[in-house]
Amino acid sequence: MWGSHKLTEPAMNRALVSLQSYVHMAKALEVNSIKAVATAAVRLAKNGDEFIETVKRETGLDLECISGEEEARLGFLGVINTIGLKDFVIFDLGGASTEVTLVRNRQIEQSVSLPIGALTLTGTYQKGDEFTDKEYNKMIKAIRNAIEEQPWLKNTKMPLLGIGGTARNIAKMDQRKLSYPITKLHNYEIPYHRFTELLDEVRSKPLGQRKKINGLSSERAAIIIAGMSIVYELFNYVNCKTLVVGGSGLREGLFYDYYGHNYLGGNPIIPDILIHSAENVLLEMTRHELVHAKYICRLADTLFEQWWSLHKGDNALRRCLQVASLLHDIGKRVNYYSHARHGCYMLVNSNLYGMTHIEQAFRAFLVMNSHGLTPKEYKNFLYGKLLDDEQRSIGQKLSIILAIAEALDESHEQLVMNLDSRISPDEVRLIIQYPKHRDIDITKGAVEKLVKPFKKEFKRQLEIEWSPQ
């Protein structure tokens, strides 16, 4: 392909078949508008314009060849609306180019499209089946020259956030080595030392053996050395310790660009991606379920604040409890009687953005443990290996808070008007105000069942005072 700098006939034919299938499905679903863009491979190819004309003729699609700057902007939108970082360096590593963007306070400070990609570097410098040492060193020199022309990247010491096929394959390889319990790649973190171990492994194996590496797709095995070498040089130039892998990129950026301009007053950057995505998941609920979920969230948040001296949780833990409270019944979509177990799985696998994998596992623990884990369930908790003893300990405390909040609306009638707590060394007195003309027996029964678990966890007696108003 890159000997002549032209798109090959087989490559163009594969793309056309995919686009024709896409257009066919879009028509079947009565889609009235399609936005289609082409990136560096078409932008840099001598026959790129010819390919765009062929696409128009064969599919009816107006394929827009976007600039490197626009490619970086759209990649940024896909990342910033799905990853909870404020300051970081994005790289979108493709076949023909690498878009690099410096982000500060969730805004683009500077970006560049580097003319180095996994496919073009392999095609340019690898002349045989494998890189010779001389060829590899030439490629590394070319990568460094391209990166070092951007002094604004040097020693930023910010996390690297990678999107694109190379980044995803790196994450898959690392997860398989660790027998990682969460298969999701989005927001997966890889420390520098584990990345270099992976790079050493792929460099040490010929193509046939690389194809057998668990987690590495056979289609990418031929170009993975060049791709990972770009990441390695970025790691060193930026001088950072962690690679974060993003599952959302340019494609999602196209959506957020449209969504922002049409539904967010022209701003394609969502202010609070965690709450926004949680509320998006809540859209699947009925009106009554939604009212109940938001009510439980308010009650749990009130108890978190009033009982702070008992758990000493920070604001990040408060947000964990808020999201777990909002989505505590999500598992009922699968099965009512075991909804806590299903909710645990769904919390980890739903499109909830702005959370690390550890935070996802922690929220799942809150939901599952709020219904009481047996010793066997606790030991075999699927995502437990991601939580340390301290996280489990605070998780058990917050689980009790969530359980009591749920019990306070056991009847789904939203009867609790106000909560007030009086805390002493031996006792917590919870004063619950409710309408005097309403029957509160269902709620009373549910709350009283949690007095014993509360004492076991907080080492204090929970005294309930029911106060009709």
Label each residue range with its predicted role.
Residues 2-25, 39-46, 51, 59-81, ...:
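Helical "lid/coupling" subdomains associated with nucleotide-phosphate turnover
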Residues 27-30:
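Non-catalytic positions within long, well-ordered alpha-helices that form the structural scaffold/packing
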Residues 32-36:
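Conserved beta-strand/loop subsegment of P-loop NTPase cores
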Residues 96-102:
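Acidic, divalent-metal-coordinating active-site segment for phosphoryl/phosphodiester hydrolysis
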Residues 331, 445-456:
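Feature 926 captures the class I aminoacyl-tRNA synthetase adenylation module centered on the KMSKS loop
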Residues 410-415, 456-460:
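Short secondary-structure junctions
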Residues 430-447:
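A short interface-forming secondary-structure element
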Residues 457-469:
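A short amphipathic beta-strand at an alpha->beta junction
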